[in-house]
Amino acid sequence: MRIRDMMTKNPITVDSETLVIDAQKIMKENDIRRLPVVDKGKLQGIITKHDLLEASPSPATSLSVHELNYLLSKMKVKEIMKKNPLTLTPDTPFEEALRIGQDKRIGSFPVVENGKLVGIATESDIVRFLTRALGIREEGSRITIEGLGGKLTDLEKIISIVNQHNTIVLSMISLPRPE
């Protein structure tokens, strides 16, 4: 499984000169939490809802509402975006992306091919992909088989039983034994 199989292709983007207030509006209107920042076709960074919250003034500020609105209306994405985000290619194995995301606590990856942004892989994309891969929305029975030795002969036995009952396997997953 590769990232190309689960990423959001041609994601909504902004350029580095976009006003923060406009980026907030784009995120809200499209129900998204991240925006890649692209200038002249090249990825410059990424801005998240969290970045926008961090850039917002504290409620304890001594500035007036008008002063706050003025400051926010002038702030640009390039001032608060994360520059040079960790990226993936469309051919990155799904499992590797999952490992990197967990190890580095990253919730999304811009996907770049030949220097161009071609997609974004987010936590939501991963959940959607796993839901499809595991057949969660498909009708049928779920069977859990525990205690297998992990040998090919065990899998052959399972497939033989499934075939005897003229059943279709939509998905199969193997988990390591708990220590």
Whereabouts are the PLM-identified features?
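Tandem CBS (Bateman) regulatory domains
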Residues: 1-10, 49-86, 93-102, 122-163, ...
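Short acidic/polar active-site loop segments enriched in Thr and Asp
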Residues: 33, 107, 168
